[in-house]
């Protein structure tokens, strides 16, 4: 009987999701996803869902949704980076820190990209939200590793 293959993906299987997600983030940083354009879609929807909300309240919800998107994008990127870096398949502080640093650097490059996109802008607050999402991703992975850690006999 032939030996079973390892379920651990190779380098391409680990890094392709990272590259694909980074491409999605880059696309979301384009002018197509500016506040003005997302507002044109979301504000009428929010207005229909919350007919008594003031325009200021609707704008605040729209802004909050955009910030939640930043947070979530980088939470996912951070988890994918960790998966690509953690070849041993057991929780590693080194891989977690490196994933967080790489996600933070990509977030910085994303903000610089937005600086040049009409209708977008670079904001330190967006970068902090991005890095917070990446840190949350690493926190979730660490908590999961702690929960499923083998207990000493």
Spans of model-derived segments:
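"…centered on the first transmembrane helix and the immediately adjacent amphipathic helix/loop
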Residues: 2-78
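Membrane-interface elements of multi-pass transporters and channels
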Residues: 34, 84-88, 116-120, 143, ...
């Amino acid at each position: 009987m032939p030996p079973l293959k390892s379920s651990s993906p190779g380098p391409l299987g680990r890094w392709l999701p990272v590259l694909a997600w980074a491409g999605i983030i880059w696309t979301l940083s384009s002018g197509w996803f500016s506040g003005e354009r997302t507002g044109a879609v979301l504000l009428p929807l929010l207005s229909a869902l919350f007919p008594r909300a003031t325009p200021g309240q609707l704008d605040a919800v729209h802004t909050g949704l955009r910030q939640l998107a930043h947070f979530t994008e980088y939470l996912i990127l951070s988890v994918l980076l960790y998966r690509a870096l953690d070849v041993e398949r057991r929780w590693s502080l080194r891989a977690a820190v490196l994933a967080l640093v790489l996600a933070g650097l990509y977030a910085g490059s994303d903000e610089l990209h937005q600086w040049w996109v009409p209708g977008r802008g670079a904001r330190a607050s967006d970068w902090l939200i991005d890095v917070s999402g990446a840190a949350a991703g690493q926190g979730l992975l660490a908590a999961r590793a702690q929960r499923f850690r083998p207990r000493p006999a």
